[in-house]
């Protein structure tokens, strides 16, 4: 049992996802040349764990009823979101500020459409979640890449560099907080610097906070509205149950917009696109944002903390490899620059030698070229196996 009195989840359970239309497991051979028969899928950012029992019960209740109509009367769903943000993050969210989209990427696309024009620039601090650049370019906007600095092995901001790279046509910044793939939890001072930069340059700030619940002991995520309450007239915050509770297939997300004028613009674009809620996602989210869901998240972050410690210790003992310190997320960011190998060489050793599928760092933009991203949200035995395979694949460098 958890300390809150709920059944303890078994994250050590090995669940075979092959043959279930899993993007993570059923496409890795085609994309990475790693067979599911003996390979380890550590790329797509979903977890190999069952969601909390409260989520399972919500789906079972829907199935037992047997009618899957349009969703209506969202008061309970909105109350669950507000309860979660208040109790877990100390953030009081007005009901009228909440919009429901089909997920983070969909929410990003609507923001780009609603708040910029074709030919405008959108600033990204790279390396960063690769879907942002894709959405921006597909919308006919320009990606303004601003590489993050590295200080004492961690990513940091260089606002002076941002100032040199933007143009009068740069209209928006997308912040990843906590950061994917670098695992940073930005400090109050860092978030304040972002806010000040956006005010100075009249930018809309879209803050992707989808990993806000997956923060490790000793770190504290600060929602941007609390870090910089004076910028609410230019702020959009995106969150979701999908990452926290491993229900990405539900395709639902929350877009929280404090300012009424920005809400009007966002709502107009949503209506033009005919976007409405996924009833499965809303039922699951309502169940997840609960005391039982909170107990599950506490158990999850404790388990993931053990996985990251095991992975970091093992990988950092391999000559030439360095895992960036992970403060949040379950996505380890490993630098292979110390091997002296070309990108093709170290990727070949990981995929063909270690038989591991991991995200290629170059897809995350400038600064990611020497990295691979490894998903640690899997049973610990599999993490141990991955570390041992990497040790053998790069053993000749010792």
Where are these regions (language model features)?
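Conserved N-terminal alpha-helix of the aminotransferase class I/II PLP-enzyme fold
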Residues: 62, 69-102
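Glycine-biased, low-complexity coil/linker segments
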Residues: 20-32
């Amino acid at each position: 049992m958890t300390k809150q009195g709920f059944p303890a989840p078994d994250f050590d359970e090995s669940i075979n996802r092959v043959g279930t239309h899993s993007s993570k497991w059923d496409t890795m051979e085609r994309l990475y040349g790693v067979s599911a028969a003996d390979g380890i899928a550590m790329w797509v950012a979903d977890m190999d764990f069952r969601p909390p029992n409260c989520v399972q019960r919500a789906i079972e209740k829907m199935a037992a009823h047997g009618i899957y109509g349009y969703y209506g009367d969202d008061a309970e769903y909105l109350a669950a979101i507000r309860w979660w943000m208040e109790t877990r993050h100390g953030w009081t969210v007005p009901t009228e500020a909440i919009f429901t989209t089909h997920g983070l990427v969909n929410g990003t696309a609507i923001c780009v459409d609603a708040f910029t024009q074709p030919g405008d620039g959108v600033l990204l601090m790279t390396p960063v979640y690769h879907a942002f650049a894709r959405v921006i370019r597909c919308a006919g906007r320009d990606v303004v890449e601003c590489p993050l600095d590295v200080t004492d092995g961690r990513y940091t901001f260089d606002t002076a560099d941002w100032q040199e790279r933007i143009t009068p046509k740069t209209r928006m910044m997308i912040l990843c907080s906590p950061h994917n793939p670098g695992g940073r939890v930005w400090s109050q001072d860092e978030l304040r610097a972002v806010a000040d930069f956006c005010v100075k340059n009249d930018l809309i700030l879209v803050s992707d906070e989808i990993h806000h619940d997956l923060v490790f002991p000793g770190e504290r995520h600060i929602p941007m509205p609390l870090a910089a309450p004076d910028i609410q007239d230019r702020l959009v915050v995106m969150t979701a149950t999908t990452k926290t509770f491993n229900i990405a297939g539900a395709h639902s997300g929350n877009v929280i917009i404090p300012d009424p004028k920005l809400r009007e613009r966002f709502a107009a674009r949503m209506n033009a696109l005919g976007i409405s809620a996924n009833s499965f996602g809303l039922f699951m989210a309502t169940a997840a944002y609960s005391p039982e869901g909170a107990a599950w998240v506490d158990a999850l972050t404790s388990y993931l903390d053990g996985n990251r410690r095991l992975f970091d210790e093992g990988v950092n003992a391999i000559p030439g490899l360095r895992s960036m310190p992970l403060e949040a997320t379950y996505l380890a960011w490993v630098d292979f620059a110390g091997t002296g190998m070309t990108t093709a060489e170290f990727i070949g050793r990981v995929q063909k030698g270690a038989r591991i599928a991991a995200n290629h760092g170059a897809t995350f933009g400038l600064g990611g070229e020497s990295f691979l991203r490894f998903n640690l949200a899997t049973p610990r035995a599999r993490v141990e196996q991955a570390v041992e395979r990497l040790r053998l694949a790069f053993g000749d460098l010792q």
